[in-house]
UniProtKB/Swiss-Prot annotation:
Pfam families: RRM_1 (PF00076). Keywords: RNA-binding. It comes from the Eukaryota. The lineage of its organism: Eukaryota, Viridiplantae, Streptophyta, Embryophyta, Tracheophyta. PANTHER family: GLYCINE-RICH RNA-BINDING PROTEIN RZ1A (PTHR48028:SF2). It comes from Populus euphratica. GO terms for molecular function: RNA binding. InterPro entries: Nucleotide-bd_a/b_plait_sf (IPR012677), RBD_domain_sf (IPR035979), RNA-bind/splicing_reg (IPR051106), RRM_dom (IPR000504). Coiled coil: none annotated. This is Glycine-rich RNA-binding protein 3.
Length: 48
């Protein structure tokens, strides 16, 4: 089982947020993984 933190999703906008203890672990552990039949991309948050 893959352990990760709290997950929230945007209102059908194709994005979500995952809370990890370490940014590098989040990117390396989840980038490219299958989530509910979709291949996901994980990167650091960008300010608008």
């Amino acid at each position: 089982s893959r352990g990760f933190g709290f997950v929230t999703f945007g209102d059908e906008k194709g994005f979500g947020f995952v809370t990890f203890g370490d940014e590098k672990d989040a990117i390396e552990g989840m980038n490219g993984q299958d989530l509910d039949g979709r291949n996901i991309t994980v990167n650091e948050a960008q300010s608008r």
